[in-house]
């Protein structure tokens, strides 16, 4: 969305694309908190973390309680839209405000209006303050995600407590994997990824601002 608005400064066609990205963001954020209109959320209140969810043919759901980067990614989806910044883009501004005002059941959970120093702006974020604090408790814990060199792709919690589903398991295994699938690659089993660590830092700066 931000890239599309930047391009819209040279080509107004990109305004409609920016709006499309905004609407998709809202739809995805709302679905994460109310899957299939059944009031089932990817967020787990007991664990304070986001999980993947499996939906069975009978309509029931089951969370995959794997503490991985998947549960941290919602932090990335944070952006600030200042009304002064979108003033030059009248098509985007008009449709943006219409969507915010007429789709409140969707936008109220991930699009928040603020006034700071007399300036109007909207904060776009999937996580609320309470969820962010609970995620950070795990993210900044050396016994979970925080290592001396960055953020682990899988919590160290799973070193002694692997997640088991059927005949498969996910265990913290940051070196060469015991499983030879894909040549023994263990990227999702604990190693540090430089790009994701950067994205986490950048997202926290955005949320903090």
Please tell me what each predicted stretch does.
Residues 1-209:
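Acidic, mature catalytic/reactive cores of soluble proteins
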């Amino acid at each position: 969305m931000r890239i599309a608005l930047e391009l819209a400064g040279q080509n107004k066609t990109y305004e409609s694309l920016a709006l499309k990205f905004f609407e998709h963001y809202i739809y995805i954020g709302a679905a994460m908190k109310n899957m299939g209109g059944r009031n089932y959320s990817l967020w787990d209140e007991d664990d304070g973390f986001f999980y993947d969810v499996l939906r069975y043919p009978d309509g029931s759901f089951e969370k995959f309680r794997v503490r991985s980067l998947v549960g941290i990614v919602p932090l990335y989806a944070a952006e600030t839209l200042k009304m002064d910044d979108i003033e030059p883009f009248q098509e985007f501004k008009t449709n943006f405000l219409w969507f915010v005002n007429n789709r409140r059941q969707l936008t109220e959970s991930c699009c928040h209006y603020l006034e700071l120093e007399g300036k109007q702006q909207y904060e776009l974020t999937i996580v609320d303050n309470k969820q962010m604090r609970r995620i950070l408790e795990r993210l900044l814990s050396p016994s979970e995600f925080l290592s001396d060199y960055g953020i682990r792709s899988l919590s160290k919690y799973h070193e002694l407590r692997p997640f088991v589903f059927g005949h498969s398991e996910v265990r913290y295994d940051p070196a060469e994997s015991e499983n030879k699938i894909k040549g023994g690659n263990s990227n999702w089993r604990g190693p540090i990824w430089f790009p994701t660590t950067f994205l986490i830092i950048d997202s926290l700066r955005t949320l903090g601002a």
